[in-house]
Amino acid sequence: MALDIKLLDIIACPVCKGKLHYNKAVHELVCRFDKLAYPLEEGIPVLLENRARPLSSDELSS
């Protein structure tokens, strides 16, 4: 199930409250400021800090 792009206008990073970006290739919401990627489960964002994975420097540069 795909993410409803309209959600990106109303949701924010739970850590810094900043804007999230959708990485369609891996179905994750990315916070570049905190260097975290939040998973999507069946199209639903899981915005829990303990479920986020840290982004590598390679991922941040792309």
Curated annotation (Swiss-Prot):
Cellular component terms per the entry's GO annotation: cytosol
At the top level, the lineage of the source is: Bacteria
- Pfam families linked to this entry: Trm112p (PF03966)
Give the InterPro entries listed for this entry: Trm112-like
Question: Family per UniProt?
Answer: Belongs to the UPF0434 family.
- Name this protein carries in UniProt: UPF0434 protein AHA_2776
Native organism: Aeromonas hydrophila subsp. hydrophila (strain ATCC 7966 / DSM 30187 / BCRC 13018 / CCUG 14551 / JCM 1027 / KCTC 2358 / NCIMB 9240 / NCTC 8049)
